[in-house]
Amino acid sequence: KINEPTDGKILVNGEDITHLSGQKLKKFRKNIQLIFQDPYASLNPRMTVGEIIREPMVIHHIYQTRKEQDDRVAELLKIVGLKPDHVRRYPHEFSGGQRQRISIARTLALNPEFIVCDEPISALDVSIQAQIINLLKNIQKELGIAYLFIAHDLSMVKHISDRVAVLYLGTLVELTTSEELYANPQHPYTRALLSAIPIPDPKIEQERDAKKIRLEGEVPSPINSPAGCKFQGRCKCAMPICRQE
C-alpha cells in the first residue's frame, strides 16, 4: 500500500479489506485488478508484450511451466484482438488503442473476479474509444467479470453501466440503476451533468440550450469543504438543512 486510509471502510463481498496486509493482501490483489488511464505510461518500455502479460503469472506463481504461461499469453492476446506474434514486440511499436488492449490482457492474466477501470478510454482517440468499450463489454459477457468503471463521459457510462454512482468532491450524491439515473435523476448535481451532455443536432441543441442547468458559484476546496452538503453553495434547491447534513 502507498497510503493507509484516514477514514471509512472498503467492503468487497461483505469483507472489510481496508487494512489487509501480507499474504492476505496478495491473495486479494490476485482477484481484483486495475486498468490504468494512460496506456503510454502504464506499460514498461523495457519489457516485451509477452513479458508484460506474463509478469502477474510469475508474481503469483500461476501455471507450473513456461509453456503453460506462454500458451496463456497467446490466448489472452487473441481475446483482446491482438496477434500471437506480438509477444516479442515492445510497447512503443503499438498505437494507443493497441497498448490499452495489452493492458487489458495483462489485467486478465490472473482470472480476476473484479476489475477497476480507471478512465480506460480518456487518453485514447475518439475513434478508438468505442472499440475498447465494446471489447470490455464482450469480455464481461464471456468471463462474468464485474467492473468498477470510473469515468466523466456520461454517454459512455450509460453504454456500459448497470448501476451508476455520482460523486461530487468525493461524496456520493446519487446511486441507482443506469436506466433510472438517465430517465429520472434525483440530485441537482446529476441533473446538471445530464443537461450538459451535447446532442449532435444543432437545431435540437439550440432548443434545449435554455433548459440547461448552469452551475454558478465557486467549487469548494476538497480539503476544506463546507459543513453539510458539499454542493449547497452551487445548488438552486439548497435549503437550511443542507448546511447541516
What are these regions (language model features)?
Residues 15-16, 58, 67-85, 194-195:
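Conserved ABC ATPase "signature" region
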Residues 4, 17-33, 59, 180-185, ...:
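ABC ATPase NBD coupling module
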Residues 109-113:
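A short, proline-enriched helix->beta-strand linker immediately N-terminal to the Walker B motif
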Residues 177-245:
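Short catalytic/signature loops enriched in Gly
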Residues 8-16:
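Conserved ABC transporter NBD signature motif
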Residues 90-94, 98:
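Conserved ABC ATPase signature
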Residues 116, 120-124, 128-207:
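P-loop NTP-binding/switch modules centered on Walker-like glycine-rich loops
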